[in-house]
Amino acid sequence: MTENKAENKQTEKTEKMEVNIIIISDSAGETAFNNAQAAAVQFPDAEVNYRRYPFIVNEKKLAATLEEIEQYPNLVIVYSMLDEKLQLPIIKFAREHKARYIDILSPIIEAISQTTHMKPTGLVGANHQLTNKYFNRISAMEFAVMYDDGKDPRGFLEADVVLLGVSRTSKTPLSLLLANKGLKVANLPLVPQTHIPNEIYQIDPTKIIGLTTDPQVLNRIRRQRMISYGMDPDTAYSNMDSINAELDSAMALYKKLGCFVINVAERSIEETAALIMNHLSYEED
């Protein structure tokens, strides 16, 4: 009898209540996610799952998101949306599915409204119009960080441009520079004999940029990088045969995709960015 009680107590300790926290945002959702995390640490005995849905900017994307999360039990929806048209479906969904929901922005907007005796609807509209360029850049920068280095294949489908390239072809700094121009950029490092995400083949080839370089230039850059880390510069990473194989593999993929290719050897990232923007016929606001 004593053993059974002990086992029951042990089972109670190991079984955790599952909570699915859904983060929905019209931007990267970092604020909503950070708030959810800060709250969730107060419940160490709960099994908390975070499911993030960033850049939900229209009703179609929101509908798909709500349809997807319907499968999860014990929902807590944390959302950050400026557009009321996108807030209402979330509230309706939450009520119909008996889910808890938290609006990150409205309490702050309401507090400012009460303090200033101003109507938030007019203020938000005017502010958005005046600072649209700024917010687009911030959103693009957050996007570039979130989808850097192939972290999440879903980003490829949402991006304005996707950069492909072997290691040390300036993918990340180029992504950030283009993001500062207002473009949503995702990038993927290419390594021979590794799986290419299916999403890459679903993208319009005109949105894909294949980065390449000269073998000797890449060899020099990689050797210098190893030396800066206090490591042996003569490794497979900087070996000319390996470099040639990597570049050949990348070029074969670019040919298969039919994408635009840029040789970044001896080019500044500003020059490369200009070539990409010209290719996309993109003009900065």
From Swiss-Prot:
This enzyme's EC code(s): 2.7.11.32, 2.7.4.27
GO molecular function: ADP binding; ATP binding; phosphotransferase activity, phosphate group as acceptor; protein serine/threonine kinase activity
InterPro entries in the record: Kinase-pyrophosphorylase, P-loop_NTPase, PPDK_reg
Transferase listed as a keyword: yes
Any single Pfam family the record assigns to this protein: Kinase-PPPase
Residue numbers binding ADP: G165, V166, S167, R168, T169, S170, K171, T172
Sorted UniProt keywords: Kinase, Nucleotide-binding, Serine/threonine-protein kinase, Transferase
Catalyzed reactions per annotation: N(tele)-phospho-L-histidyl/L-threonyl-[pyruvate, phosphate dikinase] + ADP = N(tele)-phospho-L-histidyl/O-phospho-L-threonyl-[pyruvate, phosphate dikinase] + AMP + H(+); N(tele)-phospho-L-histidyl/O-phospho-L-threonyl-[pyruvate, phosphate dikinase] + phosphate + H(+) = N(tele)-phospho-L-histidyl/L-threonyl-[pyruvate, phosphate dikinase] + diphosphate
Family statement: Belongs to the pyruvate, phosphate/water dikinase regulatory protein family. PDRP subfamily.
Primary role: Bifunctional serine/threonine kinase and phosphorylase involved in the regulation of the pyruvate, phosphate dikinase (PPDK) by catalyzing its phosphorylation/dephosphorylation.
Entries under HAMAP family matching the protein: PDRP
Protein name per the record: Putative pyruvate, phosphate dikinase regulatory protein
Source organism of the structure: Lactobacillus delbrueckii subsp. bulgaricus (strain ATCC 11842 / DSM 20081 / BCRC 10696 / JCM 1002 / NBRC 13953 / NCIMB 11778 / NCTC 12712 / WDCM 00102 / Lb 14)
